[in-house]
Amino acid sequence: FPTRRSSDLGARNFQAVFWNVAYYDKYYFNSLFEHFVFPDGSKPDWGSLSWLQKRFMKWFNEERTRTVLTFPVETMALLTKDGDVLDKEYGDFTAEMYAEGHSFFTYMSDNADSLSSCCRLRNEIQDNGFSYTLGAGGVSTGSKSVLTINLNRCIQHAVKSGILYPFFLEEVVDLVHKVQLAYNENLKLLQAKGMLPLFDAGYINMSRQYLTIGVNGLVEAAQFMGIDINDNPKYEAFVQEILGMIEKYNKKYRTKEVLFNCEMIPAENVGVKHAKWDKEAGFQTYRECYNSYFYIVEDKSLNIVDKFRLHGHRYIEHLTGGSALHMNLEEHLSKEQYRQLLRVAATEGCNYFTFNIPNTVCNKCHHIDKRYLHECPECHSENVDYLTRVIGYMKRISNFSQARQKEADLRYYAPVR
């Protein structure tokens, strides 16, 4: 099934179906399904689910050594308390799977009010106005529209025009919300005309779909303002100011029927387009593809803990649509090292992350190795390609767009010492 679902389909312009799998620890499972009852009166059984989760994860990890499988994107959901995971068994199992070379995301929360899937996508189950936009775990939420603000261009335009950038940015944010509301009215009109059959059939609930305000160019905007891109008070204040403003307007325009969230978008294509358009317009761009993280992907000065900190609670608290940390490493760590990094993530409040170690694919004999190698260990050919994450999902670097291939070549993969 995963193999077939990862195949290209003509109905999606020859792209694979984007789908997700969520795993739960015992406490997460109990919080979500403790009072759930099936129509026949039976209840979900943790023991059988835990067995199935572990079996599927082990099998899928092995399957990825046989063929290139982009999907599903997997997420391990862990509840945390006092700087560590509550379920020590699943904390150890998560570290074990990372050490065995498996590629998946981990989502951490101190309460089971949310689920995550994909690269930076979360559902909040409680009605508190926070949600990633793809949906997971049977909670029928998602995004019906994403409008992205190019922060670098907005701030540079304001400064060059002699305007205080917070005033100009506030105008842009307000306008984007009004455009989203207009789009929402158009959707309602289409549904009234019977043109949205999936909504009518109940597969998608209009009132639970979010209007997403995307952000891109945050790092580049900070660089333009002369701010160092590392964990420092000036950068923290800048991030809080920008994202806090968007969250304020999300709350202002929110109603019982209209929900907003803010997301640092993956920007697989638009990160390249923004940089290209800005360069042509005479703005400083700093790189050919704008970052989708709170750090510069090519920066060699930041260590692993620095990056967890930059994606920790002090920086992401206003990102109600989320942002994932991609921890790029040259090689896999030990189970004990990964287990310690789970504690670091819990302590720093980095709630969504993955470890990204390029997998080697031989173009001659098609052998797949979970390690980052320059020669095939089977046939010793140097004609190799690499599987890594373009954004949230894994694919061959040779299948990236040309601009993304250049960006991938610049990424810094931290050596393990």
What are these regions, as identified by a protein language model?
Residues 1-207, 228, 232-377, 381-386:
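Conserved catalytic cores of very large enzyme subunits
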Residues 3, 151, 156, 208, ...:
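Generic structural "secondary-structure junction" signal
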Residues 101, 214-217, 321-323, 356, ...:
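Glycine-centered flexibility motif
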Residues 200-221:
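Core structural elements
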Residues 220-228:
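Well-ordered alpha-helical scaffold segments within catalytic/enzyme domains
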Residues 363, 378-417:
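Long, charge-rich boundary regions
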